Amino acid sequence: MTIRTAKFSIGDIVKHRHYHFRGVIFDVDPIFSNTEEWWLSIPEEVRPSKDQPFYHLLAENDETTYTAYVSEQNLEHDGSGRPVSHPEVGEFFTEMEEGRYRPKSHPTH
């Protein structure tokens, strides 16, 4: 299995290519790192390959906010310039600058 370099970074605002939601990336897995049950719950005809980066998003749609786990092939940059209204954005990021969020720096112990 070849591990690819991630196309997106923590703080990037992205949107799903097929479903109507967007969000800010707060973590990246270099390959699929969720449960087999979760992966098998995706219809086979649209199931992404596991050997690509997967992203943890603070996501939103027109109705609610939530966290999402999305394959790289299903994401694209969101060029709207709008902030993400997820209530946990402030736990991970300080401010939005030039269309992306600046991660909080965490002191090392």
State where each predicted segment sits:
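Short coil-to-beta-strand transition motifs
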Residues: 15-24
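Basic/aromatic-rich interaction segments and small domains that mediate binding to polyanionic partners
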Residues: 2-5, 9-10, 25-96, 100, ...
